[in-house]
Design a protein with these regions (language model features):
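N-terminal "assembly arms/tails" that initiate or stabilize quaternary assembly
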Residues: 1-89, 258, 317-337
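Protruding loop/beta-arch "assembly-hinge" segments enriched in small, turn-prone residues
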Residues: 1-26, 245, 251, 259-266, ...
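Short alpha-helical segments and helix-capping/turn motifs at coil-helix boundaries
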Residues: 35-43, 173-175, 266-269
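Long, contiguous amphipathic alpha-helices that act as assembly "spine/axial" helices in icosahedral shell
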Residues: 56, 83-149, 181-190, 194-195, ...
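Short helix/loop capping segments that flank catalytic or ligand/cofactor-binding pockets
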Residues: 64-67, 108, 198-201, 207-208, ...
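Alpha-helical scaffold segments that mediate packing/assembly in large oligomeric complexes
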Residues: 104-178, 312-314, 319-328, 332-337
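Extended, solvent-exposed, turn-rich assembly/linker loops in the middle of proteins
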Residues: 143-221
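Extended serine/threonine-enriched, polar tracts that run as long, contiguous segments within proteins
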Residues: 192-196, 202-204, 211-282
Length: 337
């Protein structure tokens, strides 16, 4: 039987609310449209409803195989053994609860909690997932062996010039330096609003309308050098030196990050506390999910608890390469604009 409750005299069914949350994707539409997040059934099946750490297989590329043999009727066609690798993944579990004093409703006739349940929970979780994704990207880029995936144009002294800002060729040059001839696979550009404004002024950032197979509709999205632009001021600037802000702009490739949700017990529920403050209604939410950058392993033994914090995701010491760095489709430009 569904666990139920009351919010502002509104009958709450946790199962129905869960279905509603699943229908209202908690992943940003821009992230979905870019295709950087790839649902991975292997990850989903490996973690399933139990466990939070798993080793999942990576199938090695054959790009560097020797040339095909000459079929001359004499040469033996000796098979090359296919090899695979594994990368370690770890689910991140998050929870958040809200409460409302019923006295507030008594005075105003309005229910903030009801409004939150109907309108704000989905945007909240979209923002949280986006922050975890950016933290993961930051950690990966600082890992040993990923040095060529970062270009630093910034300065923290003297004066800021155009050379310290992103220009027409900046993303092209970084893409080539990071992954060589695979640079055309970059599909998402995450940047601060100051960087986006700079690109707009140069007419390098423009709105493009097209049909998105992922979203199933026509969309108009900002794009720069063929990449969809996600503009966010969170996690994209180091303002330690106010006169020389350093902006981090991230490039992510299509299908670069495997993802899957992990089953959690009672993801949504309500409770009425008769005792506290003359009565309080509470809404509880939980989510668990995996962001697994292909080609990288998280060092699960370095994670203190059973779920990595955002700071632990950001820490490069908690990540290591599981393949050639060129198969990690993540890169970063540091600039002053």
């Amino acid at each position: 039987m569904a666990r139920t409750g009351i919010i502002n005299n509104f009958y709450f069914d946790a199962e129905v609310f869960t279905d509603y949350m699943q229908e209202q994707s908690t992943i940003n539409d821009i992230l979905l449209a870019s295709g950087v997040l790839q649902y991975d059934p292997i990850i989903a099946n490996t973690l399933g409803s139990s466990g939070n750490v798993a080793a999942v297989p990576m199938f090695a590329s054959i790009d560097n195989e020797e040339d095909a043999l000459n079929d001359d009727g004499k040469t033996n066609n000796v098979p090359t053994e296919l090899k695979g690798k594994k990368m370690l993944i770890m689910a991140m579990a998050r929870m958040k609860a809200w409460k409302e004093k019923t006295y507030t409703r008594y005075l105003t006739g309005k229910s903030p909690l009801h409004n939150l349940a109907n309108n704000l929970v989905v945007p909240y979780w979209k923002a949280q997932r986006q922050l975890d994704l950016i933290a993961t990207i930051q950690g990966v880029l600082g890992a040993e062996g990923m040095e060529t995936h970062v270009t630093d144009l910034s300065t923290t002294s003297g004066s800021i010039t155009e050379a310290n800002k992103i220009a027409l060729t900046s993303t092209i040059d970084l893409g080539q330096k990071a992954v060589g001839d695979r640079r055309g696979n970059f599909s998402l550009f995450i940047c601060h609003s100051a960087v986006a404004a700079n690109l707009r002024k140069q007419e390098l950032l423009q709105n493009v309308t097209y049909y998105s197979d992922v979203l199933g509709k026509d969309v108009t999205l900002p794009m720069v050098n063929g990449m969809i632009c996600l503009e966010t001021d969170t996690g994209t600037v180091d303002a330690t030196n106010a006169n020389f802000p350093v902006y981090s702009s991230y490039m992510v490739g299509r299908g670069a990050i495997g993802t899957a949700d992990k089953l959690v017990h009672a993801p949504y529920g309500v409770e009425f506390d008769h005792e506290s403050n003359g009565g309080e209604e509470k809404l509880y939410t939980k989510q668990a999910y995996v962001y697994a950058p292909y080609g990288m392993s998280i060092k699960a033994t370095e994670i203190v608890e059973e779920s990595p914090t955002r700071d632990e995701l950001k820490n490069p010491a908690n990540w290591e390469l599981a393949s050639d760095h060129k198969f990690v489709m993540i890169a970063c430009i540091k600039s002053n604009g």
